[in-house]
Amino acid sequence: MIARILDGRTCAEKVKARVKENIRLLQEKGLPSPGLAVILVGNDPASATYVAHKERACQAVGIRSTVYRMPNTITESELASKIDECNRDSNTHGILLQLPLPAHIDPANLLERIRPDKDVDGFHPYNLGRLVQRRPALRPCTPYGVMTLLTETHENLEGKHAVIIGASNIVGRPMALELLLAKCTVTVCHRFTRDLAEHVKSAELLIVAIGKPGIIQSEWIKPGAIVIDVGFSRLSPNKIAGDIDFETAKERASWITPVPGGVGPMTVATLLENTLQAAQTFL
């Protein structure tokens, strides 16, 4: 068996085309384009690269983006004031606080400070609570991007045993909520999980989001499983790896995402979707 490739770049282009068309329709009605505020703290090269990518994606679909670059020495209260300013700005429909933040700043406090209806990352407790209640509003970008990508398989997910490796607030936990919403039976594995291999072997849908290359051995993968690799590690300037060895895993899976070119583009595309959705509540 050779797995079919779940191409995140192609799927993301479909999402972006829909967003661009909807923005064009807004403009035809004389309404303003959606506005996104991105708050970037410090000079972390990876964060700067991600923000630049998001800026280009916004420009391509017609979203106005403004990046507020803050020094690494900024205090939590100063950063909170900037968020408050964006909350009040009627031309800003979405707010994104680029993570990670410097060690002296508590991200939870600041993510909660963003207005829920402008929380385009989907991390506010209100938006996560809506997902828990099966009434989603703005949804976390990576998990919802994965769900959109899974539609490309045309597989019925109802009743499938989905195993998530990783329990972060950004991916693992909201991913579990999304899969429950899709009527999967969900197992979440984390650093205290015993017999990880046995859990992986039972997965009909395997989602790995740890950031440790090779953490999942390919022989653990159930033949015919759908495999989603959210991991992203830069091994050298020119080499990026996921959490699973793609070349050996594709011999067992029915569908698999590459790294790069799998989940990453879907995260950005979902951010654009969320920004449009947020704008539509104001316009």
Swiss-Prot record:
One of its GO terms (cellular component) is cytosol. PROSITE patterns: THF_DHG_CYH_2 (PS00767). Pathway: One-carbon metabolism; tetrahydrofolate interconversion. It comes from the Bacteria. Keywords: Amino-acid biosynthesis, Histidine biosynthesis, Hydrolase, Methionine biosynthesis, Multifunctional enzyme, NADP, One-carbon metabolism, Oxidoreductase, Purine biosynthesis. InterPro entries: Aminoacid_DH-like_N_sf, NAD(P)-bd_dom_sf, THF_DH/CycHdrlase, THF_DH/CycHdrlase_cat_dom, THF_DH/CycHdrlase_CS, THF_DH/CycHdrlase_NAD-bd_dom. Pfam families: THF_DHG_CYH, THF_DHG_CYH_C. One of its GO terms (molecular function) is methenyltetrahydrofolate cyclohydrolase activity. It catalyses: (6R)-5,10-methylene-5,6,7,8-tetrahydrofolate + NADP(+) = (6R)-5,10-methenyltetrahydrofolate + NADPH; (6R)-5,10-methenyltetrahydrofolate + H2O = (6R)-10-formyltetrahydrofolate + H(+). Its EC number is 1.5.1.5, 3.5.4.9. The keyword Hydrolase applies. NADP(+) binds at G166, A167, S168. Transmembrane segments: none annotated. Homodimer. Belongs to the tetrahydrofolate dehydrogenase/cyclohydrolase family. PANTHER family: C-1-TETRAHYDROFOLATE SYNTHASE, CYTOPLASMIC, C-1-TETRAHYDROFOLATE SYNTHASE, CYTOPLASMIC-RELATED. Catalyzes the oxidation of 5,10-methylenetetrahydrofolate to 5,10-methenyltetrahydrofolate and then the hydrolysis of 5,10-methenyltetrahydrofolate to 10-formyltetrahydrofolate. This is Bifunctional protein FolD. The lineage of its organism: Bacteria, Pseudomonadati, Pseudomonadota, Gammaproteobacteria, Legionellales. The gene is folD.
